Amino acid sequence: MPRLALLFALFFAPLAAAASENGIVAIASRYDVVQSVDKIEAAAKARGLTIFARIDHSGEAKKAGLDMRPTQLLVLGNPKGGTPLMQAKPSLAIDLPLKILVWQDAGGKVWAGYNDAAYLKRRHGLSDEQAKPLGAVGGLIEAALK
């Protein structure tokens, strides 16, 4: 059994690394951008997270007379959890609160993207324990968009 687990890990590790090579993990959504952000926002609030901002990039572009495919950014977090991390690693404040970007690509597909916890761990020199809560955003998105 341990050999099977090792084989499984060795096979899938490169796939996980490739998915977040640039630090961004993208999850496909079957909903449009507004519905996706609504669902993610509701799931975040249900988990007790604070919504700091919801930025409609495409809406603001339209106000400026520019065209942009639907794109929204949700800024969310938990000050009780994030503040101690930023106290320990002040550079982490550039990436906190957490951000979820939801956009429609050129083919009409909608994606929800976030910074990979492993990327943030490397970027800021976090311990496994410090990085662990940052990885929960993926599960939040997947649960919201199922």
Kindly give the residue locations of the regions a language model identified:
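Terminal, regulation- and interaction-focused segments at domain boundaries
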Residues: 18-48, 143
